[in-house]
Every structure is written in structure tokens, then in C-alpha cells.
């Protein structure tokens, strides 16, 4: 199957459309032919059933970091949607970063250390009459093999003051921490998921050849160094994706976080629901089979309900 950009952008009004609501961001996916779900169903982590033939097959698990890159991209798309659903009012949120002083590479320890911190933080909230927030946490691999963790704390009201040096850092106790307000960004999920996938050029060049992306784009962005200082570095877009080990739980969240909502309609009806919102992206794709025949056309659009207000 090959994916090609369509010549001209013209989704038919009667095309089937999936509308995904993610806080202030709405995604429209219109398609010429409706997909009624995958032709397979998962049995367990190693086996699946082909619904067309009834046969049971084994999954071909990715054995290398390269095999895992596409899976990580899909997970980061989930992260993007989850953040956009919940981080909608910047003053109600805080973005925390947790690191290790040593080159800590143990995934299980990372999970255990986070759970211990979370229990301590909940007790601190009780003692200080602070409402317990919801959280979304995402792990980030470093080129040297160590792990960082980024966590969004989300309150239903203005976030309380959290002193990084006297509250968060001592409570964590494994390395430097950073606690900051969420910047007035109208698509925090897109910014953050790109932040997780990108990598400083100097770290990227130190990777083994099989860990490097085959093609990449270099930009300049502000990043936090090992001492917690913000510096400007050359960044390799998508350079960090291959550092995530296969099967790792990249994202974790509290039970109360909101999830994206989905509805189905014609493209024409979906357009009415985003009327007045600012379109931030659109692209059309042609899905072509190995025999050269077009299988389907898919059109994607993103709308932002806040950006219009910001521009007025």
C-alpha cells in the first residue's frame, strides 16, 4: 500500500467523516470509502484472529528500535489527543519534568519512582489543603540511555503555587526537576508530542547508526540541558523515536482525565459543526494498492476553537 498526496483538495460533501473532539482542537477525517474496522481482532499479546479467514496468526513483534518507530508515532498521537482534551486552560495546569542525576536506564525503577512521588504528592496536597490534580505523564528517553519523565498536573481551577526547589525537587530526590506554567499555546498537545519526538543534534550524532533516523530535518529550538538550564540547540525532527524500546508503556494518566470523543456523519454535516473555528491544517491522501489502483481517498483537517479568539 502506498500513500500519495492528492492533486487538488476536494473532499465530496457526502464523504463519510469521523470527527474527533479534543478540547479546543477538532480533527476531521473524511474518506471516500468507509472503513468498518480492522479485519483482525487481538487475542493476546502474541496472537490475533483474521476475521476474513478465521485463522489464528502470531504477531510479528518489532525486535529493533527501528521497527518500533511507527508504533511510537501512533502512541504520541494518542498523547497529543489526551493533552489537548485536558490542558485547555493554561492557568489551571503545570508542566513538571523529572530527571535522574545518574545514568538511570531501568524502566521498572522509573515506574516505581513515579508511583512513590505521586503518593508523596497526594499526602502533601492533603496537608496543605490543595485539591488533588489529574495527571498525564509521558516518559522521554535520552541519547545516553537515561530516562526523563514529563507530567502535566491539571486542576479544575487555577493551579496552586508549587515551589520547585522546596516542594517538588526534595519530594522527587533523584535529580533535578523543573516546574513551570503552561505557556499560552492553543495546541499544547501538538507542541508537546513534537517535543518528545525531536532530539538535539549533538545527542543524535552520538547514537549508533541503527538508532538514527534515515532522513531528518534540522531546526533550532530551546531545550533544557542536564543542569536544568534552557539553551538553544539544533534539533533533529523525529530523532528520538527509535530510542523507545518495543512494548514500553510510554504514557500514564490518572482515572479522571478526559478522553477524546468521536462522532460520525457526512463531511458536509461535520463542516457545520466546526463553523467559526480556525482551520489550522488540511491535507488529502490517495491510498494506492500494490497493483497501482486507488483503494481510497482520505482527507484530514484540524480546527482550533481558541485561535480565532486570539487573532481578533
Where do the PLM segments sit?
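Cys/His-coordinated zinc-finger cores
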Residues: 149-153
